[in-house]
Design a protein with these regions (language model features):
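Class I S-adenosylmethionine-dependent transferase superfamily signal
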Residues: 193
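Short alpha-helix
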Residues: 221-236
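Short "lid" loop at the C-terminus of a central beta-strand within the Rossmann-like core
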Residues: 208-214, 222-223
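A short helix->loop->beta-strand "cap" motif at the edges of active sites that frequently abuts
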Residues: 140, 198-201
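Conserved N-terminal segment of class I S-adenosyl-L-methionine
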Residues: 3-169, 173-177, 186-190, 226, ...
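Conserved beta-strand signature within the Rossmann-like core of class I S-adenosyl-L-methionine
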Residues: 200-209
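Histidine-centered divalent metal-coordination motifs
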Residues: 178, 182, 220
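Helix-to-beta-strand junctions that scaffold the AdoMet/dcAdoMet cofactor pocket
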Residues: 183-184, 197-199
Length: 270
């Protein structure tokens, strides 16, 4: 009986993995229904890409992060995100998640006056666009950056950005939820953030906490600790690691949440 319970537990905890393996098996035998072929093809290609990720090495930088070595090229990553990442997932059309609500509540708690007037917001790696929608409803101007493009939900104050180099204005909030770990060059990204920020810009990031991680998790290219945020910003207003229930865990939480109304340290941008 214990063996049966263990098998059931393994299956329940890995439902997505087993479902994808079965779908790929049917796909290879040309038995998958036509309406699912595109999705399963993307899942299959994603697995092939992930094998390539696992061939890289993981190195540590004293500024507080691990990174893939050699870092994948921009062409490699762009193709992956444009053609495979979102196509292999089914959650982009579920725009509001508990995490988005938690982020909005924390933003309002740390900066109570944030909604008093309309702000210009960059959602970096916007994906499903959860916080973008909440801030849009609060009358802010939204700019969504994502290789896979966020759903075009509104006709005003809702903008799609596909190239950071084309941005030349300043933002009041630069936000990224589980996106910094996907970039190709963190120094270039932080330099660009500094260029499009002003002295009162709020930075809000959430990333996986990798202080004890020595394992590559495709398609992540960077693996952060809180030390990264302490090193890169002049000060911070909130920097905690949290478990899956949102409870603070010193350095042992599964994610890092960081908020700061300060500048990126100039000496790190040279």
């Amino acid at each position: 009986m214990k063996f049966i319970k263990k098998l059931i537990s393994i299956f329940v905890n890995n439902q997505t993995l087993f479902r994808n393996l079965f779908a790929i098996f049917l796909y290879k035998l040309n038995l998958i229904p036509d309406e699912y072929k595109g999705r399963v093809n993307s899942i299959y290609k994603k697995q092939q890409y992930e094998k390539k990720f696992l061939k890289f090495n993981l190195k540590y930088n004293d500024l507080g992060f691990y990174y893939l070595d050699p870092i994948p090229t921009k062409v490699f990553l762009n193709k992956y995100y444009e053609e495979i990442y979102w196509q292999s997932r089914g959650d982009k059309n579920y725009p509001i998640r508990l995490r988005d609500i938690e982020h909005y509540k924390l933003l309002k708690k740390i900066y109570p006056d944030f909604d008093k007037d309309s702000k210009k917001v960059l959602n970096f790696g916007a994906g499903h666009g959860g916080l973008s929608i909440l801030l849009y409803v609060a009358n802010h101007k939204i700019y969504n950056f994502d290789f896979g493009q966020t759903n075009n939900l509104f006709s005003e104050r809702w903008n799609q950005v596909n190239d950071l180099c084309k941005i030349d204005s300043k933002f009041d909030l630069i936000y990224g939820s589980h996106s910094l770990e996907h970039v190709q060059n963190i120094k270039e990204i932080m330099k660009k953030f500094d260029e499009i920020s002003h002295e009162n810009t709020i930075y809000f990031f959430e990333v996986p906490n990798c202080i004890n991680s020595k394992k590559i998790v495709p398609p992540h290219t960077y693996y952060f600790t809180r030390k990264f945020f302490y090193n890169y910003f002049e000060k911070y207003d909130y920097c905690e690691t949290l478990d899956n229930s949102g409870i603070k865990k010193n350095d042992e939480g599964v994610v890092i949440r960081f908020l700061s109304k300060s500048r990126v340290k100039k000496n790190l941008l040279k």
